[in-house]
Amino acid sequence: MKDGFIKVAACSPKVVLADPKANADAIIAALHRAAAHGVRLAAFPELAMTGYTCGDLFMHELLLDSVETELLRIARETANLRLAAVIGAPIRCADKLYNCAVVISRGVILAVVPKAHMPNYGEFYELRHFAVPSRTELGSAAPYIDSLQTFFNPDGCIFSCTDYPDFRFGIEICEDLWVASPPSDKLAAAGALIIVNCSAGDEIIGKADYRKRITEVQSAKNICAYLYCGAGEGESTSDMVFSGHCFAYENGTLLAEKAPFDYANDMLITEIDLGRLLYDRRRVNSFCAGNAAHSGLFVDFSLGFGSCGPAPHEDLPETELTRRFPRNPFVPHDENELNARAKDILTIQALGLKRRLEHTHSMSAVIGISGGLDSALALLAAAKACDLMGIDRKFVHAVTMPCFGTTEHTKQNAVALCNSLGVTLHTIPIADSVRSHFRDIGHDETCHNVVYENAQARMRTLVLMDLANALNGLVVGTGDLSELALGWATYNGDHMSMYGVNAGIPKTLIKYVVRYYARHCENPALHDTLTAILETPISPELLPADEKGNIAQKTEDLVGPYELHDFFLYYVLRWGCPPAKLFRIAKQAFRESEFSNETILKWLKNFYRRFFNQQFKRNCLPDGPKVGSVCLSPRGDWRMPSDAVQRLWADEIQKLS
């Protein structure tokens, strides 16, 4: 439960039709197994106590009496488990029979929640046996079921853990999800962070994917987690087959899935990040948490971690993480999705630049080309902008400006790239200009300090700006999102342009966009050049090459691996992760990588230090298009004072090991 992680389970054990005792035995065994794994919330299918396909046997008192007896036994025999269980069962109330979910925790039946919408079409005929909950018949107060010693609430409940108040869940049953206005809408708006669905939907061709798509959208629009548990083996196959399909979504992202017909596996276990959900609800001010009318019960329960009220953070158990955290969160895992995203990124860049060029009546686009990844992507976007405007690519003026650290390899790549794309190429050596500047300010050329490096960067920007004036053009910036986060840019040097097309794209994603273009360009020379650029170490080339003429100054040796920094950037900006939680997630994500825990912590410290110290550069960024959900534009997504102090974050990092 530390860091906001709650372990949940969807359990679909083999059901024995019309035998509540046998089913209770299976449920008790499953709950003990789940508790051994640290599960805090366990869900079972719709009508799990009897099976969904009992037919007219649901009307028999003997069956219903047994259900109540066995529910009380489940409560007794799981009283020492620190979890809440949601179990489907037929329940009598006020002379009617209802299809319900029964919530049990620490030996107590907390409440009974009835299904709100009864399907009575196609293969379903639930109205034959079950009533629709109605306030007209039940009255304004929640009825009390003496035999179960608990309340029956037709308007649903929100269950809140007093030990950890962020742990709040609501329930809907099968068909409730499929209607135009599901109960989960109001439950989420009133504060529920997890929705449990006890289901018994039969399996037909295409239904599993459709079911997932509906759940994906429901969890995304309600900024909640959704735990779906479907009935499976043991149900009657007279007319239908039940697959035991179970899965969990978190804010539109699939966390885990037990595939349909996987009867050998009767339990799905994963972790839900409540902190992530809360952060997004606070961030999205249009989400109406706490403001929606909810007439149901708010039921408190304790898992025994706090003596009275919320437990101190140090007393909460640490949830073992099994969920997957991608090492490259900006990069889709699926190749088709990655290709589609790369195509969209290039289009966004090109359209943004096209609009700016047209608005300023520019006669050219001027770009500094280094032979590296960032300038290559900026040039590709500029070439595409020309194509969209229906003009010759000669409109783009690419400028190489070799100096002290330029290698023959990168210079050749830059020239080959420009020739392959058909843009106008300028080569303007700047070494003499920089030496003249050194003489003007009294700097020794043999002193390779920050003056030596930044003078070259600013000279390149000066050349680009003046050339743009001469050509009635606009300087296109090449700096990327990762560099902006770290402040890895010379202030008023490569930091400055007239429109930055790469400002919303992290370094780890840029290489995949360039790779996509290389694979789909149908130009062998361009493909080979882009491939060579992809294989070149990332470097500003501001220090002299080594004795073999190779790049000596490698960015990742100085500021750290971009794979780590982009990981940090994503979780800090997108989900507001504090350092301790971020370090924990990073260790999980990179546990099978070349990065040790010590290495991760080293660069995590560096990331926070640079992120805070370099905000002054971000606060005066040129315009540039937003591309993804993480962006650092001071006019949009990230507004932070340049003199904000990082002490709180630094102190937390200091405690890590």
Question: Residues of each region from the PLM?
Answer:
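ATP/NTP-dependent adenylation/nucleotidyl-transfer catalytic domains that generate, transfer
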Residues: N23, P165, I223-C224, E233-S236, ...
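Enzyme catalytic cores with a strong preference for nitrogen-chemistry domains
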Residues: M1-V366, K384-R393, L425
